[in-house]
Amino acid sequence: MMNIKVSDDQAKTVKHNVGVPMPTTAAHRGLAERLICLHDEIKGDDSLGGLNRIAIALYDESSDILKTFIHSSDGDNPLEHSTAKLSEMPGLKLLARMGGRRTLNDLEKVALAGRDHAIRLVASGYRSSYTVPIQSKGMFYGFLFLNSFETGFFTAPVLHRLRPYAELIAQIVMRELDTVRMMQAAVKVIRQVSTVRDEETGAHLARMARYTRAIALKLAPRYGLNDEFVEYLFQFAPLHDLGKISVPDHILLKPARLTPQEFNIMKGHVARGVEIVDLMVGDMGLQSLPHFPMLRNVIAYHHEAMDGSGYPYGLSGEAIPLEARIAAVADVFDALTSARPYKEPWTNDKAFDLLRSQSGTKFDPDCVAALVDSVATIGDIQARFDETVYD
């Protein structure tokens, strides 16, 4: 077990604040709103007034998925909550591998060739496109897409004017993502150097993160969740049980039911997780960590229950942050359907039945319904991140 020391003053501050969920609504629009402001600034240049859309798509190498992230659009955003396999997009795949830029000054011709993304862009009025891969030091992050309602907009003079803005946007995105990755790497090191041998396998964390994403995408229309919210929840969900590194192995790995005293010790991992992440953010100078309130809320409240019977604060209903309610369903589902030394894995249907039976009491009904409605996605995740293959 790792011994992480927290001063009395630090502990009091954490415990005083953690019982009240941190507001996340405004923070979730952080990078997107900055992009909107920059878009307005760009259009202030008379020669660039026809730039009608800026969008970022991120790449998940482990699943070969290119997914929409943030955008600033004058008209509709036809590609929100979209994903596609990069390997099935030859043009973008080549661009990611070779670098360079791609200019398409007549999207209608591309749409006639049956390209789905081009068809959707044209249907929303866009007529030209300019694509820039976001990459640095051998790492590929995704793409920057620029679009105009005008056919032939991206001329050589326009591209010359746009180049510094494109580089600035790419740098902003990479800096934000690098901050998140730094936190993830630090947590991974903590797990590795501690003596804890918990059940948080790499495959479990990969699956759990993708289940949270699947749930969030289903909930997006009803709750008004943008791609930025979905992406950061995907990034932060695997850190939910960070505090378990402070739980003794004989309790954490016990194959039988815990005694009341042992369960009280186990429950302490929530507060410890918040303490640890607060200290890491402070000590590592990560105060700019994007959407820190979301991360903190996931760690602090994913063991709360809709009827108030959860721990450690006894919150109920919508007092529990949505991100924590989503993470709770994803975490329990993967625990049920995973093999453990003391149990066989449940079938998906059996796990769904249990979640449904506790919908509205333990779990958010919307989150349960969203997961159950993602059967095909769940199957793909389980096949791709099988314990025997991924770990």
Feature locations, PLM:
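Signal-transmission linkers at sensory-effector interfaces
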Residues: M1-C37, L48, T179-V189
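Signal-transmission/dimerization alpha-helices at domain junctions
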Residues: M1-I4, E41, R101, K137, ...
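Regulatory loop-to-helix N-cap segments in sensory/regulatory domains
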Residues: M2-V6, Y141, N147-R163, V173-E176, ...
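Amphipathic alpha-helical coiled-coil segments that mediate homodimerization
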Residues: N17-P23, A27-D46, I54-I56, M208-I215, ...
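GAF sensory/regulatory domain recognition
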Residues: D40, N52-A96, P238, L242, ...
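Regulatory sensory and allosteric helical modules in signal-transduction proteins
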Residues: D76-V122
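Metal-dependent catalytic cores of enzymes that make or break cyclic nucleotides
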Residues: V110, V196-D391
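A short, aliphatic-rich beta-strand micro-motif
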Residues: R127-Q135
